[in-house]
């Protein structure tokens, strides 16, 4: 799968603006940002737990 180019990103942005309207767009962006922060922190925590469990396995 190839990464999205500028034309595809522009189309997606236009669709988002049409669907949500320009008034709700800042709220949607804020919500997406919060969700991404939570997702990233959960991934870091999961990786940390996985490393700790593999360290425990190696010690035993």
From Swiss-Prot:
<comment type="subunit">
    <text>The Tat system comprises two distinct complexes: a TatABC complex, containing multiple copies of TatA, TatB and TatC subunits, and a separate TatA complex, containing only TatA subunits. Substrates initially bind to the TatABC complex, which probably triggers association of the separate TatA complex to form the active translocon.</text>
</comment>
<protein>
    <recommendedName>
        <fullName>Sec-independent protein translocase protein TatA</fullName>
    </recommendedName>
</protein>
<dbReference type="GO" id="GO:0043953">
    <property type="term" value="P:protein transport by the Tat complex"/>
</dbReference>
<dbReference type="InterPro" id="IPR003369">
    <property type="entry name" value="TatA/B/E"/>
</dbReference>
<dbReference type="Pfam" id="PF02416">
    <property type="entry name" value="TatA_B_E"/>
</dbReference>
<feature type="transmembrane region" description="Helical">
    <location>
        <begin position="1"/>
        <end position="21"/>
    </location>
</feature>
<dbReference type="InterPro" id="IPR006312">
    <property type="entry name" value="TatA/E"/>
</dbReference>
<keyword id="KW-0653">Protein transport</keyword>
<dbReference type="GO" id="GO:0033281">
    <property type="term" value="C:TAT protein transport complex"/>
</dbReference>
<keyword id="KW-0813">Transport</keyword>
<comment type="function">
    <text>Part of the twin-arginine translocation (Tat) system that transports large folded proteins containing a characteristic twin-arginine motif in their signal peptide across membranes. TatA could form the protein-conducting channel of the Tat system.</text>
</comment>
<keyword id="KW-1003">Cell membrane</keyword>
<keyword id="KW-0811">Translocation</keyword>
<keyword id="KW-0472">Membrane</keyword>
<dbReference type="GO" id="GO:0008320">
    <property type="term" value="F:protein transmembrane transporter activity"/>
</dbReference>
<comment type="similarity">
    <text>Belongs to the TatA/E family.</text>
</comment>
<keyword id="KW-1133">Transmembrane helix</keyword>
<keyword id="KW-0812">Transmembrane</keyword>
């Amino acid at each position: 799968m190839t990464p999205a180019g500028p034309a595809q990103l522009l189309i997606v942005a236009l669709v988002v603006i049409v669907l949500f309207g320009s008034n709700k767009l800042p709220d949607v962006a804020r919500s997406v940002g919060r969700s991404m922060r939570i997702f990233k922190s959960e991934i870091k925590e999961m990786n940390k737990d996985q490393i700790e469990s593999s360290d425990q396995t190696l010690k035993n």
